[in-house]
């Protein structure tokens, strides 16, 4: 399946092949659970299945966050990618900051690299991008200094895109994620949310990943992660109205239904 990432209302369903996801919905190495979740996504019309084998929950908030090796990560994600690719015609993204994991995932059928590191973790990721033609999700993940949050995010993203272009990477392959929850305080996340508009990012495809993030829990007074469904959907709809077009969601099936109904009413 060839997915146009400039299309409106693209929904990415989260499939955590982990046991320590902050949202508590990881399937671990259970292929049956993974396929059941993926089938639900596909049947509901969810556009992308995002498979990740390493928890990205912030160490500053959650205890017991341990980095996993490439081998550990591969042992989790590859069997699941194989199973999804064998059973469903759906776009798959690999959620990894490691180039060797991303490369192997691509060999097994992943279409998109979803890297939260902003190319700061693995220097070989650029080399992988040079020898493949897969889309790459560039996530802002850099400490915010003084000044407007949105301005620094845009500047940091633009610098990284310019560097990628100098390396021969076609900008048409790039999807931008403004990086809610990564290297940002609660106040900075809220400011970014309030001031977000896709025009500031030169009309690149924009992926939003606010789903169940801790800053939404703070502003809605929902410390329980399972109680953040409504605020997560409200956040995504607000950012949709500001030009975002790809939405990484834990409750992807519900969100797909909601935006489909909205389309019927317009």
Predicted regions and their residues:
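N-terminal amphipathic alpha-helix/helix-capping segment at the start of soluble metabolic enzymes
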Residues: 1-22, 162, 167-171, 260, ...
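N-terminal structural segment of carbohydrate-active enzymes
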Residues: 3-14, 29-44
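Active-site loop-to-helix "anion-binding N-cap" substructures in soluble metabolic enzymes
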Residues: 4, 41, 46-48, 76, ...
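Residue-level marker of regulatory loop/turn positions in helix-turn-helix DNA-binding domains and
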Residues: 4, 94, 224, 228
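Structured loop/turn residues at beta-strand edges in well-structured enzyme cores
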Residues: 6, 44, 108, 169, ...
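Structural preference for beta-strand elements that scaffold enzyme active sites
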Residues: 10-14, 47-50, 91-93, 111-112, ...
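Active-site-adjacent loop and "lid" segments of alpha/beta metabolic enzymes
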Residues: 21-40, 56-79, 83, 88, ...
């Amino acid at each position: 399946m060839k997915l146009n990432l400039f299309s409106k209302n693209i929904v990415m369903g989260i499939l955590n092949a982990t046991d320590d996801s902050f949202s508590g919905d990881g399937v671990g190495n259970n292929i049956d659970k993974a396929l059941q979740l993926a089938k639900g996504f596909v049947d509901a019309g969810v556009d992308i299945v995002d498979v990740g084998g390493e928890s990205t929950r912030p160490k500053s908030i959650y205890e017991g966050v341990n980095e996993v090796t490439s081998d550990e990560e591969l042992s989790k994600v590859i069997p699941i990618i194989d199973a999804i690719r064998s059973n469903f015609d759906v776009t798959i993204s690999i959620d990894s900051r490691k180039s060797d994991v991303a490369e192997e995932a691509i060999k097994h059928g992943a279409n998109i690299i979803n890297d939260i590191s902003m190319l700061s973790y693995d220097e070989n990721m650029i080399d992988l991008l040079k020898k493949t033609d897969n889309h790459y999700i560039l996530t802002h993940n850099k400490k915010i200094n003084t000044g407007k949050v949105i301005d620094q995010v845009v500047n940091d993203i633009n610098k990284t895109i310019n560097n990628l272009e100098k390396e021969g990477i076609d900008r048409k392959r790039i999807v931008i994620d403004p990086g809610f929850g990564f290297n940002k305080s609660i106040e900075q996340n809220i400011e970014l949310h309030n001031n977000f508009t896709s025009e500031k990012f030169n009309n690149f495809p924009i992926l939003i990943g606010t789903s169940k993030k801790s800053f939404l829990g703070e502003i809605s007074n929902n410390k329980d992660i399972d109680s953040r469904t409504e605020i997560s959907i409200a956040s995504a709809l607000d950012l949709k109205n500001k030009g975002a077009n790809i939405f990484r969601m834990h409750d992807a099936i519900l969100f797909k239904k909601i935006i489909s109904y909205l389309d019927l009413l317009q």
